[in-house]
Amino acid sequence: MLVLGIESSCDETGLALYDTQRGLLAHALHSQIAMHREYGGVVPELASRDHIRRALPLLEEVMAQSGTHRDDIDAIAFTQGPGLAGALLVGASIANALALAWNKPTVGIHHLEGHLLSPLLVDEPPPFPFIALLVSGGHTQLMRVTDVGVYETLGETLDDAAGEAFDKTAKLIGLGYPGGPEVSKLAETGTPGAVVLPRPMLHSGDLDFSFSGLKTAVLTQMKKFEAAKLESEALERAKADLARGFVDAAVDVLVAKSLAALKQTKLKRLVVAGGVGANRQLRAALSAAAAKRGFDVHYPDLALCTDNGAMIALAGALRLGRWPEQANADYAFTVKPRWDLASLAR
């Protein structure tokens, strides 16, 4: 089965072709970072308009890369939610318009299911069951994954997502957009232990997260720096130490909760997905813990940590392979800006 995947939930337009026999044939991605940078964050209306501009050229690109003709495609998968309503509508409209013109069925995909399954795109994919740590700008969750479509939420953030905390911390420190990669890069130059920040809910006894207090601690520390009237060079060193303190605290919590989930479920496989899954400090800490504790940890390729069409095409192929009745051939569709992954129907 050959599936075209279309991702447009936020500020990346992604298209890809996935074949159940040959694997990922082609994928193309356009990021809107440069467009949104001057606003310091994603502007939904601009995001929607840019998806309209980019989708068809990206389609031509993946078709040319793979030597695929439209007649070769068996189905079209699109991100149905969660995400920005306007952005989702663009992708859904394009998917269903193509499907109508080409006489193909469609299937709507949960954005987080795409992330959760993206590590299956590697050469040696992890077998089910496993624990999934989903960490992105909008979500932080621990899931027990028994099979495709069989997901149980074990813990989630009670306020800010981890990626949101990274972005907001970067803004407080005075770094550029997008903040996550910038604060991580600065943290690598900071001194370990120079600034120690709280580890929220580290000993809460459950698998939930909270990052708003950590963000507040960064704000408090920045106010102290301002009150001290540090010279320029000293201030930059202090900011680097603060960034290191923030990243260390966030990573400690993510690792500790992941280990607790593995212990609670007695599983030996951890899958890490979402944009924050590209963070080098997090990967290093989890890999070290895996070596020490005797479990396996799996990541998607770095290029597939961000939003992308490949994960949507894969999820579509897996769903249609198991449940052909989920194929939609009447081209009526809705989008779901809010959508709980645990409620996803098989």
From Swiss-Prot:
Alphabetically ordered keywords of this record: Acyltransferase, Cytoplasm, Iron, Metal-binding, Transferase, tRNA processing
Catalysed reactions, as listed in the record: L-threonylcarbamoyladenylate + adenosine(37) in tRNA = N(6)-L-threonylcarbamoyladenosine(37) in tRNA + AMP + H(+)
Requisite cofactors: Fe(2+)
Enzyme's top EC category: transferase
Name the UniProt record assigns to this protein: tRNA N6-adenosine threonylcarbamoyltransferase
Cofactor note: Binds 1 Fe(2+) ion per subunit.
Chief place where the protein resides: cytoplasm
One MF term in the entry's GO annotations: N(6)-L-threonylcarbamoyladenine synthase activity
One GO-annotated biological process of the protein: tRNA threonylcarbamoyladenosine modification
InterPro entries recorded: ATPase_NBD, Gcp-like_dom, KAE1/TsaD, TsaD
Transport among keywords: no
Superkingdom field: Bacteria
Cellular component, GO annotation: cytoplasm
Family the entry assigns: Belongs to the KAE1 / TsaD family.
Sites where the protein binds Fe cation: 111, 115, 307
Cellular localisation: Cytoplasm
Source organism: Burkholderia ambifaria (strain MC40-6)
Role this protein plays: Required for the formation of a threonylcarbamoyl group on adenosine at position 37 (t(6)A37) in tRNAs that read codons beginning with adenine. Is involved in the transfer of the threonylcarbamoyl moiety of threonylcarbamoyl-AMP (TC-AMP) to the N6 group of A37, together with TsaE and TsaB. TsaD likely plays a direct catalytic role in this reaction.
Enzyme Commission number: 2.3.1.234
Residues holding substrate: 134-138, 167, 180, 279
